[in-house]
UniProtKB/Swiss-Prot annotation:
Its main location: cytoplasm. One of its GO terms (cellular component) is cytosolic large ribosomal subunit. Component of the large ribosomal subunit. The ribosome is a large ribonucleoprotein complex responsible for the synthesis of proteins in the cell. Binds to G-rich structures in 28S rRNA and in mRNAs. Plays a regulatory role in the translation apparatus; inhibits cell-free translation of mRNAs. NCBIfam families: uL30_euk (TIGR01310). PROSITE patterns: RIBOSOMAL_L30. It is found in: Cytoplasm. The modification Phosphotyrosine is found at residue 99. Keywords: Acetylation, Cytoplasm, Phosphoprotein, Repeat, Ribonucleoprotein, Ribosomal protein, RNA-binding. This is Large ribosomal subunit protein uL30. CDD domains: Ribosomal_L7_archeal_euk. GO terms for molecular function: RNA binding; structural constituent of ribosome. InterPro entries: Ribo_uL30_ferredoxin-like_sf, Ribosomal_uL30, Ribosomal_uL30_CS, Ribosomal_uL30_euk, Ribosomal_uL30_euk_arc, Ribosomal_uL30_ferredoxin-like, Ribosomal_uL30_N_euk.
């Protein structure tokens, strides 16, 4: 009976989130349309969420860069993590910019990363998220009891983002299909490093 009730609750939550995401998308489109009509530019809200991928090794790098990569939990090449964007984290990303590719993940990317490559940190071990009970056991006290809750908390950068993000083990991504262009050159100069804004979603597809 308890399991049935839990399943129903999870289903209701998923339905609610789906509606919320649709609403967010519609609002964005409406605002852009209104701005265009009034002859203005629509400036979207500042992104709150980044996905950061380490794209280079760190032989011979300064201790400062090494330390920041550790703080971002990017200990190996092609590791990826979610980062809440604020002044402090943006400064950290600037310090390690030549070693990372980052940008603003969309809902599809967050969804696919967590469903396909999501591992939780349970008793300091890397455990595949095959069951909602694993999530409920670790994050239930924050009302995060299933995959959909976890995705919602990360994507919307909710008030328990830190706990949800720390629960997620850094993502181990594959080497990108088609390879990298130039790891040492910034994205805006035709390379791979640095902020590629929405284009990060393309890179995630190639690595997931």
């Amino acid at each position: 009976m308890l399991r049935k009730a839990r399943r129903k609750l999870i289903y209701e939550k998923a339905k609610h989130y789906h509606k919320e995401y649709r609403q967010m998308y519609r609002t964005e489109i409406r605002m852009a349309r209104m701005a265009r009509k009034a002859g203005n530019f629509y400036v979207p809200a500042e992104p709150k969420l980044a996905f950061v991928i380490r794209i280079r090794g760190i032989n011979g790098v300064s201790p400062k860069v090494r330390k920041v990569l550790q703080l971002l939990r990017l200990r190996q090449i092609f590791n990826g993590t979610f980062v809440k964007l604020n002044k402090a984290s943006i400064n950290m990303l600037r310090i390690v910019e030549p070693y990372i590719a980052w940008g603003y993940p969309n809902l599809k990317s967050v969804n696919e990363l967590i469903y396909k490559r999501g591992y939780g940190k349970i008793n300091k071990k890397r455990i595949a998220l095959t069951d909602n009970t694993l999530i409920a056991r670790s994050l239930g006290k924050y009302n995060i009891i299933c995959m959909e809750d976890l995705i919602h908390e990360i994507y919307t950068v909710g008030k328990h983002f830190k706990e949800a993000n720390n629960f997620l083990w850094p993502f181990k991504l594959s080497s990108p299909r088609g390879g990298m262009k130039k790891k040492t050159t910034h994205f805006v100069e035709g390379g791979d490093a640095g902020n590629r804004e929405d284009q990060i979603n393309r890179l995630i597809r190639r690595m997931n």
